[in-house]
Amino acid sequence: MYNQSFSGKELYRLTTQVERRDFGLEKNGFIKSIDDEISSALLNRTYSFKFKVVNGLFLNGLSHTLPDERFTYLCQDLILRKIYQNIKKIYNVRQADRNKIVQQIQMLLDSKKDYWIIRLDVKSFYESLDRTAILNRLYKQYRLSPLTTLLLQKIFEVPIIKESTGIPRGLSISSCLSELAMKYFDIEIKQYTGVYYYARFVDDIIIFCATKECMDNLWCLIPKKLKELSLTINITKSKKISSKELKESDANSLIYLGYSFSLKETVKDGEKSNWVLYTDISHQKVDKIKTRITKSFVNVIKNGDVGLLRDRIKYLTGNYSIKNKQTLLPVKAGIYYNYKRIDSRCLYMSPNEYI
């Protein structure tokens, strides 16, 4: 049976190799230190959280955290990780795999049969979710341990979170709470007659319908269903498109998760042949990268920090390795690895050419 407790032993399981190395404690010593730090406050139900806000994100700890408080805030982070894990395990919720969704979309777009697509963007997703409804659902179902629900309650009683709306963007618990809020909406749309593919990555939704009627009906129904969750559609970023429309003009493309999908007819021996799917980075993403490059050059004029400029350009346009905190092994990152499903390099090279 899954253990929902917040003992030092359970929280130690959630530490990374980097954290174990940085604090220089062997396993039993680490577990004892965690228990010494938080067990009394948890037992007496007096534990309190401290958060800061940076660029609209709620983060663990205070902006003036002192070196000797590092372990205190590590323990707070471990508690947040345990709350996240408890919700994820008990309610079987998890965020979708972005790369897997893109791969599936490529297969569907490349099929020979007709399809009708709805692509939706939910406006201010985290900030608009009804936190009261989500928390009441957790409190009334008694599936989480009493301590887990109490700690959740204490998180939302922290003044800077209490004064905000929705789910706090940036905290580890936010993704599982939002997935829980959307769980039955996702199931209902997946099971709707005529839908043969549905995916949602946070606030981005895509639906493949077998008929135009299904597409039109859902286009009207979904805003009503989202309204029940206190959510609204960002109509300027939402779109209906059919396989026929994708083929009619080069200007027609499907933009989703930072990718641009388009169908182009190949010409062989002077005659039109098969339709080929092209997958690139979307123009919007490329433009955003170019804007950040421009700001980086403007910034170096002000501060003269060429080294910082070099790092920023590498981050924006190149590929690099970072250490996985869990395993300490190098992990590939960068623009190519963020968009590994592209099959044309014309837009991928565009930021470098811009420099």
Question: Across the structure, where does each feature detected by a protein language model lie?
Answer:
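Conserved polymerase palm-domain catalytic core
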Residues: L109-V202, I206-K225, S253
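Conserved pre-motif C helix in the palm subdomain of viral-like polymerases
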Residues: L57-N92, S164-K190
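Conserved short beta-strand edge segments in small beta-sheet-based binding/regulatory domains
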Residues: S230-S238
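Reverse-transcriptase-like RNA-dependent polymerase core
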Residues: E37-G61, L147-P159
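Alpha-helix N-cap recognition
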Residues: D97-K100, T211
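Glycine- and acidic
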Residues: H64-D68, L120, E163-L171, V202-D204, ...
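Hydrophobic, Leu/Ile/Phe/Ala-enriched alpha-helical segments that form helix-helix packing faces
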Residues: I34, I38, L42, N86-I87, ...
